[in-house]
Amino acid sequence: MQISNLGELLNATLIHEGSVLSVEGFAINLNELKTGFAFFNNDKKEIAQAVKKGAYAIITENDITIEDKDIFYFRVENLEQALVRFLRFFCEDKECEFLLFKSYELSLCKTFYFNILKGNIFTDFEKLIKAKKGEIFCYCEENYLN
């Protein structure tokens, strides 16, 4: 994804313009971060480690020190809302389906091998970012992902 498109999608403020034009993937924790990824996080220590691991873009809601002049740094008002906005776009591009159920109905989703979302964007991020084209997800919180 082009970094400029990512900034627009997130409605983010550009803190520092880096030198790379695109990112290869997305992560919210250091274990999943690879060189060339965009990193969504508010923890300053983890952001510093992400820079050392080769992140090309940092997205945070906090003021941070520019560690590397080649990296893009973005500030968002609310990291959780930015992740929801990003994942809605990402999942739409992959033509994922989302089915709303009552909480007691979710157990049936397991029977049909549907993916069940927990209702927390930080918990569900990895499952959604690794979604295959047309994958089906079930959830029970009506305002989730809105």
Which residues are covered by each model-predicted region?
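Phosphate-binding loop of NTP-binding sites
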Residues: 87-146
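N-terminal leader/targeting and accessory segments in enzymes
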Residues: 1-85, 89
